[in-house]
């Protein structure tokens, strides 16, 4: 069952955990703008990584994992259905909750949409290939 788990739920859960426990509903993105580290670059510039940047990076990595799993055919119907549920939850939360009205959460919504779309596209491709049509 762990293999049928949409890994983008991790980004969704992490975002919500932070937004609803550490965030301020009147300024939802303030907590995600906080710096969590910085790196001095060879050019002399300082690259600062915020909490929001880290969540976006995690989301992109998890989206890659999801698409690779779908392309390998290892994804199950349960995984696709849970991905659709995740997208629905993300879309509704983005529209209805002030804490979710941030650029970081929008990237999570977009990643879940891409995951669902890629799953459908790959399933259709496999089905048409199995029938011998192009």
Question: Where does each model-flagged region fall?
Answer:
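Alpha-helical transmembrane segments and their membrane-interface exit regions
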Residues: 110-119
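C-terminal ends of transmembrane helices
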Residues: 62-74, 122
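Membrane-helix boundary connector in multi-pass membrane proteins
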Residues: 90-107
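Terminal transmembrane helical module of multi-pass membrane proteins
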Residues: 121-134
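Hydrophobic, membrane-inserted alpha-helices
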Residues: 60-64, 85-93
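Membrane-helix boundary elements
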Residues: 8-48
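Cytoplasmic-side transmembrane-helix entry/capping segments in multi-pass membrane proteins
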Residues: 3-9, 74-84
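Structural signature of hydrophobic alpha-helical transmembrane segments
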Residues: 47-59, 79-81, 106-108
